[in-house]
Each structure stands twice: as structure tokens, then as C-alpha cells.
Swiss-Prot record:
It comes from the Bacteria. The lineage of its organism: Bacteria, Bacillati, Actinomycetota, Actinomycetes, Kitasatosporales. Signal peptide: none annotated. Belongs to the bacterial ribosomal protein bL20 family. GO terms for molecular function: rRNA binding; structural constituent of ribosome. This is Large ribosomal subunit protein bL20.
Amino acid sequence: MARVKRAVNAHKKRRAILEQASGYRGQRSRLYRKAKEQVTHSLVYNYNDRKKRKGDFRQLWIQRINAAARANGITYNRFIQGLKAANVEVDRKILAELAVNDPNAFAALVEVAQKALPSDVNAPKAA
């Protein structure tokens, strides 16, 4: 059986890892083993944080909506409840955009939500 020389592939693999690790501090950018561990962890962090980013943005949108809703005399919870009762299907991203860029349209939505809410908070829901 012919001998297989793997030096070219091994060097290519190591060079690829070290290129990915460029910019890391200390041994993590220079030593293959340390760089490989750090690149693996970095990819895991990257994957997890892409998932986490979605929740972070939702949290930001809710804070913006809540601030604008309170400026219009209603809480976030009652505002969303009123929009659902009025069958207004606008997601939180768009609501946050309206709250920041178009306060008049947001105020109109607040009016719609307030009209759809029962006047008595403790009143039973109509089935």
C-alpha cells in the first residue's frame, strides 16, 4: 500500500483554524490547540447569541411600547389586551417603530385599544 503524506492537509487545516483565531489574545491566536478550543467556543457563543438576540429585541420593543403607552395614559398590559380585543394584529416590532417614529398613529392605536377594553377592569369577559 502506498504511503500517504498528510502534511499539506494538516498544515491547511491548522492554518484555517489559526486564521479564524486571528485577533484573539495571547496563546489563543498563536497555538493551534488553544486556538482550536477558542474557535469552537466562539462558534458556540455565536450560535447561542443569535438565538438570544431575538429575545433581546423583543424585550427592547416591549420597553419602547410600554413607555409610549404610559405617555398616552395606559399600561403596556392593558394596551396589548385592548388590541387583542379589537382584533388588531400588529406585532411588537411595528408597534415599537410607530411609538418612536409616528406618535400620532400610536396614539390612534391606543384609542382603539381603550375603546375595545371593558370600562370595569374586574368585569367578566363576554363569551
